[in-house]
Amino acid sequence: MSGEKKEYPKEHIDLYQQIKWNGWGDTRKFLHQLKPSGTIAMTTPEVSSVPLPSLRGFIKKELTLPGEEDKPFVLDETPALQIENIHVDPPKQYPEFVRELKAFFLPDQLKDDKLARITHTFGKSLRDLIRVRIGQVKNAPDLIVLPHSHEEVERLVQLAHKYNVVIIPMGGGSNIVGAIEPVSNERFTVSIDMRRMNKVLWVDRREMTACIQVGIMGPELEKQLHKQGVSLGHDPDSFEFSTLGGWLATCSSGHQSDKYGDIEDMAVSFRTVTPTGTLELRNGARSGAGINYKHIILGSEGTLGIITEAVMKVHAVPQAVEYYGFLFPTFAHAVSALQQIRSSEVIPTMIRVYDPEETQLSFAWKPSKGAVSEFTSAMVKKYLHYIRSFDFKNVCLSIIGFEGPKKVVDFHRTSVFDILSKNAAFGLGSAPGKTWAEKRYDLPYIRDFLLDHNMWVDVAETTVSYANLQTLWKDAKQTFVKHFKDQGIPAWICAHISHTYTNGVCLYFIFASKQNENKDMAQYIEAKKLMTDIIFKYGGSLSHHHGVGYEHVPWMTRYATRGWINVYRSLKETIDPKDICNPRKLIPTIKEENNKEPFLFDVVNVKYPKL
């Protein structure tokens, strides 16, 4: 690399140390019980122990079997192991490879301590967290390298290719399908932590594009762009703890996708370092010169190489940003309104629709509002029940967002509100929208609390047509609850629509249950297979935005067809002949495809390895 090499600023080192190694998100943010009441509260960096007075009762109601409602509800303690009590095999040694690395990288860019290796072994799926919480850490990477530049990544990949070293890119570590987990300890494995590559390199206000290092985390990306008056406008649920590179590598989708598009719509070009050379694309509005090469890398999950820099479309920081809440009498009313809005060509920035069960969760998630607000809420409920004939067991909350120039927002708001009114929606004003905007990244923290108390929660998401949307929604919920309750295990499931298109939506399921007595993986595997098979039954996609990793590989041939799998396999063999780039992810091996070896996530021969 040309130029003088400088020490990296200490305040930016090791972001993985600021994120929970055995849970979700900020180490300073968590749910806990207040004593002696048992009320569940939330602590954040800004405020301590905010009571959520309805949440405990909600959990009891939904995770109690019929006939057991009068039994005492005890939140059993099932704490995670402390890191000092977790065994991790020592890293393998590869002196020749490491010697050449040390000639090019600073000592501070190479890590092999226990915390670094554990945090670069797993993502944040339920299966990941269960394993790390009980100390089942296998195949931890032997070394973590933290590059500063494209040139350093090039050098690292060249050395990995030379010495046949496995390389796995790591962004924020929020993936939930096994995309960043090393799957074997046969070869020396390096996790490439991209988070020091966190700069907006330039912004072109005329073309409205920006060149960005892809290790930048969501909040820092928007902070740097805002200084130059622009925004990317991409904020997935993982926004606080994910990177631009992760978004590109998994075909991410953000809350504002209805207006700005998904990540592939924002990407103009990028640089990708592969074992056989660096791939670069020309910038431009579009090209008709052959296949769309950027789509070879988009969604490739590090299996072809390492994305280092990307030119992205940006837009001016919006003049007006508004969010509003509405209640629909039923899910069917909400879907009808949503489809009419998409057909009207007057599209909000964001439309989210919560089904009745998730609507009740959102109500239970709220802190106490005070006597006046509670009285007002009670009066609204009476009005909706007696005058509008709303059944509160069926009501659905919706959050609608608008961004842009004030006049444009005014026009879109008026048009959209008219459609909502014609579909029996009741306006709640801007307060629910403001609350959603402030708390939109908080819900994942409930999973850590449930795991600490002998319960679990997981998710499944898909793209489904409007024709099949409601039948999939009903069948999945009924089948899931029945499957577990028939075994004497309480279960709960909800869903929301998070992204909309003219020909379908993203339907996102959240489901929970109590852990079984064996504390094994049976329930997780059953739930994963059950939900994925139901999604396929109704023509849904294998994933809308979570990706494939290795957990979805068992379904990939069924989803993508063997022909496309072979095309991708041939491409990988050409670009990555030694299979050093994130092996056994995204597509099945030939042996897996022909039933000569089990899948890494073996849902086909459903076996339940006891943990």
Curated annotation (Swiss-Prot):
Changing R352H: 30-fold reduction in activity. Residues 137-317 form the FAD-binding PCMH-type domain. GO terms for cellular component: peroxisome. Pfam families: FAD-oxidase_C, FAD_binding_4. Its EC number is 2.5.1.26. A motif (Microbody targeting signal) lies at residues 609-611. Gene3D superfamilies: FAD-linked oxidase, cap domain/gating helix, Uridine Diphospho-n-acetylenolpyruvylglucosamine Reductase, domain 2, Vanillyl-alcohol Oxidase, Chain A, domain 4. It catalyses: a long chain fatty alcohol + a 1-acylglycerone 3-phosphate = a 1-O-alkylglycerone 3-phosphate + a long-chain fatty acid + H(+). Substrate binds at R447. It is an enzyme of class 2 (transferase). Keywords: FAD, Flavoprotein, Lipid biosynthesis, Lipid metabolism, Peroxisome, Transferase. Changing H546I: Loss of activity. Residues 544-546 are annotated as: Important for enzyme activity. One of its GO terms (molecular function) is flavin adenine dinucleotide binding. One of its GO terms (biological process) is ether lipid biosynthetic process. InterPro entries: Alkyl-DHAP_Synthase, FAD-bd_oxidored_4_C, FAD-bd_PCMH, FAD-bd_PCMH-like_sf, FAD-bd_PCMH_sub1, FAD-linked_Oxase-like_C, Oxid_FAD_bind_N, Vanillyl_alc_oxidase_C-sub2. It comes from the Eukaryota. Belongs to the FAD-binding oxidoreductase/transferase type 4 family. PANTHER family: ALKYLDIHYDROXYACETONEPHOSPHATE SYNTHASE, PEROXISOMAL. Homodimer. Catalyzes the exchange of an acyl for a long-chain alkyl group and the formation of the ether bond in the biosynthesis of ether phospholipids. This is Alkyldihydroxyacetonephosphate synthase. The lineage of its organism: Eukaryota, Amoebozoa, Evosea, Eumycetozoa, Dictyostelia. The gene is eapA.
